[in-house]
Amino acid sequence: MRTRARQLILAVLFLASFGATPSRADLPPLISREILFGNPERTFPRISTDGKQLAWLAPDSKNVLQVWVKPVEVKEGKIVTHDKKRGIRMFSWARASNTILYLQDSDGDENFHVYGVDLASGSVRDYTPFEGIRAAITATDYKFPDEILVSMNLRDRRRFDVYRLTLSTGALVLDTAAADDVVAFTADSRLQIRAARAVTPAGGTIIRLRDNAQSP
């Protein structure tokens, strides 16, 4: 008897659930894939160090994200990058305000290189033109407008050493070599590496400090 009663209750609840379900006609329209996954109209605005120019990301006529730049008093901007495939996702101003720096990989391989666009000439330079490496900008400082620190696994694919990059010439000099367990570096206001973050065998994190650039 109890079994039949339980079955009856379940049947009633099952039928009631159909009545509580709204029909497809009552549902709001589906959000389009373009809204969910498409490019934004404009995003990631960045003002130059001297405060005279504004840069942002926006799609070009082929819907590829590019960097756009304009003087702050001008209404319309112009495209300064010309990527043909995946578009630009990450960029920043150089401290001298005459160069846009951006990261780009090749066909989604995530081996990002550091590029620079000279705004006066429009020329693009790959500052890390080495096959199979991955690079990133580690630090910049307004007191050193022609220099940045770049991390790159050129010497050993497992280690990301820090290199000092001169933007005007493209010269790269090894600044700080990474130990096996180091995963990140931090620079001070003089653009000197002063701290390293390392991972312990147990999965923890330790911070190593040094007094100056000559210290290990």
Q: For each predicted feature, which ranges?
A:
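Multi-bladed beta-propeller domains
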Residues: A25-E41, K70-R89, D107, D118-A135, ...
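Residue-level detector of Asp-centered blade-edge/turn motifs that repeat once per structural unit
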Residues: T49-D50, R95-A96, Y142-F144, S189-R190
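Hydrophobic beta-strand positions that form the internal "hydrophobic ladder"
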Residues: G51-A55, N98-L101, E147-I148, R194
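Beta-strand-rich domains and repeat architectures in extracellular enzymes and scaffolds
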Residues: E34-L65
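Bacterial N-terminal signal peptides
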Residues: I9-G19
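Bacterial N-terminal signal peptides that target proteins for export
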Residues: M1-I9
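Short, solvent-exposed loop/turn segments at conserved positions within beta-propeller repeat blades
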Residues: D60-L65, D107-F112, N153-F160, V199-G204
